[in-house]
Amino acid sequence: MAAPGTVASVMASKTKTKKKHFVVQKVKLFRASDPLLSVLMWGVNHSINELSHVQIPVMLMPDDFKAYSKIKVDNHLFNKENMPSHFKFKEYCPMVFRNLRERFGIDDQDFQNSLTRSAPLANDSQARSGARFHTSYDKRYIIKTITSEDVAEMHNILKKYHQFIVECHGNTLLPQFLGMYRLTVDGVEIYMIVTRNVFSHRLSVYRKYDLKGSTVAREASDKEKAKELPTFKDNDFINDGQKIHIDENNKRMFLEKLKKDVEFLAQLKLMDYSLLVGIHDVERAEQEEVECEENDGEDEGESDGTHPIGTPPDSPGNTLNSSLPLAPGEFDPAIDVYGIKSHESAPRKEVYFMAIIDILTHYDAKKKAAHAAKTVKHGAGAEISTVNPEQYSKRFLDFIANILT
């Protein structure tokens, strides 16, 4: 029986002919409650399989930063319970993102497994922009919906971002961009980007902050506070009397890294980014584990094995190799790359997970207008968030340096 199409993808820059390729579904099933997630799982699986046949180049070429692979799928009646009948999947700059994954120490096979073995899990977090978040089932990666403007901005900065990652050997607090995709289902286009989770894949976070170094309108709303794991902000952090208790060596290394990252963002005229902070309380987690085990004893067979506290949106989660027994408060730094333990004399034994998020806001005319309007409303000296990129970076660094103790 002749196959109606061939499995192929176009890895070519936009200057080349855009050929559409039609594929037949293979027997691997991608079950997800949301058809878009099924398409994402299918697409990532297809993309990694295709890339495995493409030789790794000695160096990336300028065209790699404009390239894409694009595929159209006609499902007909196969697996129609799980997949839409017709969809398109586009991956941007596949060779560049493969190179970035390698530089961040992420194996493509592991990446593929994390995103396709089981459906990503929805987070209750929603950005002000309306972006939705999902976490890979093993909590290692975050999938975020983005706008076409974000895709354009990623293309604008990708070459410089890649160069920066090469120069710092992947040792950065910037988001680790691992793949960018466009999914088309029923004529609707959705853009998604995958990053490494900031938070731990196994240590639960009980308190979460999004810090910008600004104090105007920087409190969590009542609606946000009602969530299981709210995202608190700068004024909440100050009012809680919160501090990050890390030793001098960790503090020095963290601030050096942060300074380089933020200077890079200022050069690119990027702003409005945040430091995402997640706090794991070691004693609290131990206590909850004891209670969990006691409950498991009473309700044997009913537990789903999940932690009582969920993992926040912009972070990592349950791993493929979690078989290694780790002591309370311990983590694998190869996976939980952002983790820092509290110092010996800290009031509580904690682990902090901290990294920069949301870097794709460019200081353009819209931001300048917002700055002017807020200055009129709050006064020139107010700590508003829409200052220029140089001011933003300085204020951000000063604020973060002051909360480390």
Swiss-Prot record:
It is found in: Cell membrane; Nucleus; Lysosome; Cytoplasm. The keyword rRNA-binding does not apply. Its main location: membrane. It comes from the Eukaryota. Its EC number is 2.7.1.149. GO terms for biological process: 1-phosphatidyl-1D-myo-inositol 4,5-bisphosphate biosynthetic process; autophagosome-lysosome fusion; phosphatidylinositol phosphate biosynthetic process; regulation of autophagy; vesicle-mediated cholesterol transport. Keywords: ATP-binding, Cell membrane, Cytoplasm, Kinase, Lipid metabolism, Lysosome, Membrane, Nucleotide-binding, Nucleus, Transferase. Residues 32-404 form the PIPK domain. Residues 287-326 are annotated as: Disordered. Phosphorylated in tyrosines. Phosphorylation is induced by light and increases kinase activity. Residues 288-303 have a biased composition (Acidic residues). Pfam families: PIP5K. Catalyzes the phosphorylation of phosphatidylinositol 5-phosphate (PtdIns5P) on the fourth hydroxyl of the myo-inositol ring, to form phosphatidylinositol 4,5-bisphosphate (PtdIns(4,5)P2). Has both ATP- and GTP-dependent kinase activities. This is Phosphatidylinositol 5-phosphate 4-kinase type-2 alpha. It comes from Gallus gallus.
